[in-house]
Design a protein with these regions (language model features):
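Histidine-acidic metal/acid-base catalytic patches
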Residues: 1-35, 64, 105, 155, ...
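Active-site acidic/histidine proton-transfer and metal-coordination neighborhood
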Residues: 23-27, 61-69, 81-196, 316
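Short, conserved active-site loops that position catalytic residues or coordinate cofactors/metal ions
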Residues: 32-43, 71-77
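Conserved beta-strand positions in the central sheet of alpha/beta enzyme cores
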Residues: 38, 72-74, 110, 169, ...
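Glycine-rich, proline-tolerant flexible connector loops at the mouths of alpha/beta enzymes
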Residues: 38-60, 114-120
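Short glycine-centered, acidic/aromatic-flanked micro-motifs in structured strand/loop junctions
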Residues: 41, 170-173, 201
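Short, small-residue-enriched loops and turns at beta-alpha junctions
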Residues: 45-47, 77-81, 116-118, 174-177, ...
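Short coil/turn segments at secondary-structure boundaries
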Residues: 47-51, 78-92, 248
Length: 325
């Protein structure tokens, strides 16, 4: 397995400070020991409409010059709107992101079935408002209708991606997708070799060993990409996970997740993303230096888990049935 850095971490949204140019992000990724960079296909970094072919070739050369790879381009698709024109617009953007992935030499595009988006409040990112907007925006639309719209769009997009040699990696990210079972069901219903799974541990419905391991087993060879997040500290010369401030969840069970991935034979990327408000002890918004510290610790933390995974431990016994909701 390899460890990547997702460029959204330095997009200027989640901390008090400016976005870093991609050239600086590439340099940081190399200096901090990452193997590759996942490039977010939106401003300020890589919106396809801002990049002509020359700019794309330059970006590809800059990554290669650092000895890095581009394992994926990250899209932000929402195929669950009841408004036909909005779904068509989302397809148009996603198809341009497919072409961007091709031009950057990335093998895949990360996609969502649906996405609430973010807003900038006083210049900084938050999820609060879009969660409320999503809940109240289409009160007469059913989840099943949204599911069918997403499947329809993903089928069209998968056909397009396949023609360009790109694999779509469907993330187990809400809304519409509620858990890894939904993700796998949608991949099965789309029924295209160009649509596979991006299973992320923080998004699993439960974090106990048995659930995490079974989720990885359920996904199996359909797993082509993954992300990890969180915050870290240094203790006793090692990077250790700590709870995210102001978040209503505990630690993520990355140890069981990585062990299970290793035993399933996964050889792809785990890409770190810092995509939540960077807060200090008094809930003040911290700056770029703290994000850099977290990015460095995150790489060390995942390397520790990969080293441990090279010495397999006994995982929970396989279940006869797939994990159920």
């Amino acid at each position: 397995m390899k460890v990547g850095l997702y460029t959204v971490s330095f997009s200027g949204v989640w901390y008090d400070g400016p976005a870093l140019p991609l050239t600086e992000v590439f340099a940081l990724a190399k200096d901090m020991g990452y193997d590759g960079v996942e490039i977010g296909a939106k401003r300020p970094h890589a919106n396809p409409m801002d990049l002509d072919m020359r700019a794309r070739q330059t970006m590809r050369e800059q990554v290669a010059a650092r000895g890095l790879e581009v394992p994926a381009v990250a899209g932000y698709s929402n195929f669950a709107s009841p408004i036909l024109e909005q779904r068509e617009n989302e397809l148009l953007v996603a198809k341009e992101q497919v072409k961007l992935a091709r031009d950057l030499g990335a093998p895949m595009l990360r996609v969502f079935a649906a996405w609430r988006g973010i807003t900038l409040h006083n210049g900084h990112g938050c999820y609060d408002m879009t969660r409320r907007y999503w809940a109240s925006g289409f009160s007469d639309v059913t989840l099943l209708e949204q599911w069918r719209w997403a499947v329809e769009c993903l089928r069209e997009l998968a056909d397009f991606a396949g023609e360009h040699g790109i694999t779509l990696a469907l993330q187990n990210h809400e809304p519409v997708i509620r858990d890894h079972v939904d993700m796998l069901d949608m991949v099965r219903e789309v029924n295209s070799p160009a649509l596979q799974a991006c299973l992320d541990c923080p998004l699993l419905a439960q974090q106990d060993d048995a659930w995490v391991v079974q989720s990885v087993r359920d996904t199996g060879k359909q797993q082509v990409h993954s992300h990890y997040g969180g915050e870290f500290e240094e203790e006793g010369g090692k990077a250790v996970q700590r709870p995210i401030r102001f978040a209503k969840r505990g630690l993520i069970n990355y140890p069981a997740f990585v062990q299970a991935l290793a035993q399933e034979g996964y050889q792809g990327y785990l890409c770190y993303e810092f995509c939540h408000p960077c807060l200090g002890e008094n809930h003040e918004l911290l700056g770029l230096d703290e994000v850099k510290r977290q990015v460095s610790l995150a790489q060390r933390y995942m390397r520790q888990l990969l080293d441990a995974a090279a010495r397999p431990v006994k995982l929970p016994a396989k279940e006869k049935e797939k994990a159920a909701r």
